[in-house]
A protein has these predicted regions:
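Acidic (Asp/Glu)-rich catalytic clusters
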Residues: 31-32, 65-74, 96, 100-106, ...
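Active-site beta-loop-alpha junctions enriched in small/polar residues
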Residues: 8-10, 43, 82-84, 112-116, ...
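Hydrophobic faces of well-ordered beta-strands that scaffold small-molecule active sites
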Residues: 3-7, 38-40, 76-79, 107-111, ...
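Short, acidic/polar
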Residues: 17-30, 92-95, 181-194, 241-255
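Active-site mouth loops of central-metabolism enzymes
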Residues: 7-21, 82-90, 174-184, 234-245
C-alpha cells in the first residue's frame, strides 16, 4: 500500500505571510517521506468537516498546485477533488494540462459532482440540481478526454456544454490520470468504470469492499478491466507522529479488500512537521502489499 497526502487546512502558524513557506516545506516533506501523492482540497470556502468555519483560509486549488509543482520533482499532484461546477470544462482541461507540463508530467485530474451549496451561492457560481451536476460531470470527463487526444481537435456537442474546437496545445507530457471522488453506487461508480483511472472511497473496510463489488459489476457491464482502476481511500483517522502502529494495523484491513493507496490529511498549524513525524508509516504500509 502507498501513502498520499491531502492538505485541507491553510490556517498556518505565523499567519498569512507564512503560508507560502510552509507549503513549500510540505512539498519537500511529502517527497522526502516517500509518499506518492500530494493533493489539496478544492473549495471556495472552508468546509464544516474540518471543524473550521467557512471563513477560515482556503486557497485556490490549481494556483497552489502550480506553486507545489515548482517545489517538488517526483510526487504526483492533484486536487481531491474539483467540483465539476467550479470551472468550465475546457478551461479545466487547459489548467490541468498546464500543471502537468510545468510539473514534468505529474498532474492528475481529481473530480466529482460538487456538493457544498453555500460556497456556490456565496460567490455566485451556479449550483444546478444533483441530476444535472452528474450530467455535467460526465460531459466534462468526455471533454477532457477529447482535449487530451492530439488527433481530435473537433467540436464537442453536449447537452450542457458546446465547444467549437477542443484545441489543447501543448498536450500534456503524460495524459493526466482521472480520479473520480465519491461512492454513489448508481452514478459515481458507473462513471469510474467508464472514465476513471482511480476511485476515492471512504468508510469501513466492509463498506469499501461492498463499493468495490459494485464497481466490479459496473466494469463488467462496460467491458472494463477492474484491475486497471487504482483504489484509494481517504483515511479520516490518520496516524499520529511517533505512534503509527495502530494506523498501519487499520490500513491492513483495507489492503486486504483491495485498497492501493491511503490518503491522510495533515492538520493545520505546521503540517510539514506532522508529515515529517509520520514518515515511518510509508515503509510500513509498503509491507502490506
Amino acid at each position: 500500500m502507498e501513502l498520499g497526502y491531502r492538505v485541507p487546512i491553510f490556517d498556518i502558524d505565523g499567519g498569512t505571510t507564512a503560508i507560502a513557506g510552509e507549503l513549500a516545506r510540505v512539498g519537500e516533506a511529502a517527497e522526502a517521506s516517500g509518499a506518492t501523492w500530494l493533493s489539496l482540497m478544492d473549495h471556495f470556502f472552508q468546509i464544516e468537516p474540518t471543524g473550521l468555519p467557512a471563513e477560515a483560509n482556503m486557497l485556490e486549488g490549481y494556483t497552489t498546485l502550480g506553486f507545489l509543482a515548482a517545489r517538488t520533482s517526483r510526487i504526483d499532484l492533484g486536487l481531491l477533488v474539483t467540483g465539476v461546477t467550479y470551472r468550465h470544462p475546457g478551461l479545466l482541461a487547459k489548467t490541468v494540462t498546464t500543471v502537468d507540463v510545468l510539473s514534468g508530467g505529474r498532474a492528475w485530474l481529481g473530480i466529482g459532482a460538487a456538493w457544498f451549496e453555500r460556497e456556490h451561492r456565496g460567490l455566485g457560481v451556479p449550483y444546478p440540481p444533483v441530476a444535472e451536476r452528474f450530467e455535467r460531470l460526465e460531459e466534462t470527463l468526455r471533454i477532457c478526454a477529447q482535449m487530451w487526444d492530439p488527433d481530435n481537435n473537433g467540436p464537442f456537442e453536449g447537452k450542457h456544454y458546446q465547444l467549437a474546437e477542443t484545441v489543447c496545445n501543448p498536450q500534456p507530457i503524460n495524459k493526466p490520470k482521472v480520479m473520480i471522488g465519491g461512492s454513489g453506487e448508481r452514478k459515481t461508480l458507473r462513471l469510474v468504470a467508464q472514465y476513471g483511472d482511480a476511485c476515492n472511497l471512504f468508510g469501513s473496510p466492509e463498506e469499501v469492499a461492498h463499493k468495490l463489488d459494485v464497481l466490479r459489476r459496473h466494469c463488467d457491464d462496460v467491458g472494463r478491466n477492474f484491475g486497471d482502476i487504482r483504489v484509494t481511500i481517504l483515511a479520516h483517522d490518520g496516524p499520529e507522529p511517533g505512534a503509527t502502529d495502530e494506523f498501519v494495523r487499520a490500513m491492513g484491513d483495507y489492503a486486504k479488500v483491495g485498497v492501493h493507496t491511503a490518503i491522510v490529511m495533515p492538520p493545520g498549524g505546521s503540517p510539514a512537521k506532522w508529515i515529517d513525524g509520520i514518515a515511518p508509516v510509508v515503509p510500513q504500509l509498503a509491507e502490506l502489499n
